[in-house]
Amino acid sequence: MLGDAHFLVTCPIDLFSEVRVTLHHGGPGVEAPADCPKSAAALTATLAHLGRADLGARLSVRSAIPRSKGMGSSSADVAATIAAAGLALGTKLLPDLVARIAASVEPTDGIMFPGIALMDHREGRILEALGPPPPMEIIALDFGGTVDTVEFNSVDRRSVWRSIGTEVDRALELVKDGLRRGDPGTIGEGATISARASQRVSPKPRMPAVLEFAGAAGAVGVNVGHSGTIIGVLLDAGARQGEAVLQQARQAFPDAKAIHRFRLTGGGLQQLR
């Protein structure tokens, strides 16, 4: 926590959610995929905010982001839905408004902000824009399990967060410094401190093994989602070791449910033609 504010640092990767919103005058109501109730709620909230609750809407969502892993899948869907609804009404909504509407539906990742963002995910406000990331890759290890982010964030963990405040402050300082200097090593150092500290909030049994693997593989660090089940091994993309470490991870963790290779990107919303 920063004072009394909850926060996270975004970690955008090269997986995306694509949303299409079609408006009609056939009466209010939203038609949406059954597995996207948060996006449907976000669409309803956006139309109400823009004074067009009288309109009906159809929503389609296509996403490659793994679900219920704390990887921001619903945040990406929701943010894209809000932006698409605005565009359907001829309005390009600013990221700050997208974030506020998103947070009215559920605690939200800051994926709508460009670059890397320090985000109050409960209030839907950016605390600081941290700039673009240097070239980095992530080998993401999924050992199974799912997380309900709404349920996770409904639990009062302030005492636990405060107990690790010193480590979290140091981790944030290092990540911010690494981003300023474009230094993957410093970013990785900060992320690792945060990941170790988060074991007291959301323990991951395989964390010790992944830390050992990351050190042996020459990674710059490890990271975890704020409320997720995935452990990421952070790599300096300039070292060109992504494919080799991916294969090493598959050999080292044959029990993993899935192992992915991602590229760290900047956040933000894009309009597709």
Where are these regions (language model features)?
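Short, flexible, solvent-exposed loop/turn segments with mixed acidic/basic and small polar residues
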Residues: 18-22, 219-225
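Acyl-group transfer acyltransferase/transacylase scaffold of fatty acid/polyketide systems
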Residues: 221-237
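A structural signal for short secondary-structure junctions
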Residues: 12-13, 216, 223-227
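ATP-binding N-lobe of GHMP and related small-molecule kinases
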Residues: 1-69, 267, 273
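DPxDG-like acidic metal-binding loop motif
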Residues: 69-95, 111
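ATP-dependent small-molecule kinase catalytic core of the GHMP/sugar-kinase superfamily
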Residues: 94-220, 236-273
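Short glycine/threonine-rich catalytic loop with a Thr-x-Gly-x-Asp
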Residues: 71-77, 164, 222-226
